[in-house]
Regions:
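His/Glu-rich zincin catalytic helix
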Residues: 1-107, 134-159, 166
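Short coil/turn segments at secondary-structure boundaries
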Residues: 127-131, 162-165
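Catalytic zinc-binding patch centered on the HExxH motif and its immediate surroundings
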Residues: 16, 124-128
Length: 167
């Protein structure tokens, strides 16, 4: 096995297995259920699924139109967290739901997985543990640059819509 660290701090491990024609790629991060806030257990696992669904380009039909809606949703969640009145919280929650449905009409569900599978990837999956989360698949060696680009995009430009959350 070869191990090295990139300038950005990313650790890379390469193990050649000449008996296999495909490459097994895995991206892991040091975050898991230990990082869940006490009141939101399961959040790391939920984020694993969210990160699997799309980016500003993968699964987004019109990110220029979607992005302001997501920013408004985030602002509404912040507003709801600060609101003490239960009736006002409920009204904000309804606004969030309406915005989420509106945004959901602008995205494609499962586009990330479909894109990976279209390049020959198999076993596209992920897992969340106590202190780490990973995403992996096997793919034809000639697709390594495409796999690296697609895999990096989920961390660089994640985007989530209502249709992604339902999937």
């Amino acid at each position: 096995m070869k191990a090295f660290k990139l300038k950005n701090g990313l650790s890379v491990y390469i193990w050649e297995d000449e008996s296999k024609s495909d490459v097994f790629g895995l991206v892991g991060v040091r975050a898991g259920s230990i990082n869940d806030p006490e009141e939101y257990t399961g959040l790391a696992h939920y984020l694993e699924h969210v990160m699997f669904k799309g980016t500003d380009k993968i699964g987004a039909l019109n990110w220029t139109e979607e992005e302001p809606i997501y920013k408004e949703i985030i602002a509404k969640y912040d507003q709801m967290a600060e609101e003490a009145d239960p009736a006002k919280k409920e009204a904000i929650s309804k606004e969030i739901n309406e915005l989420t449905v509106k945004a959901g009409k602008l995205g494609l569900p499962n586009e990330y997985s479909n894109l990976m599978e279209s390049m020959g990837a198999k076993g596209v999956n992920a897992g969340t543990y106590y202190d780490w989360t990973f995403y992996h698949s096997s793919f034809p060696a000639y697709q390594i640059n495409k796999w690296l680009e697609i895999s990096s995009q989920r961390f660089l430009h994640p985007a989530v819509s209502y249709t992604h959350l339902r999937a």
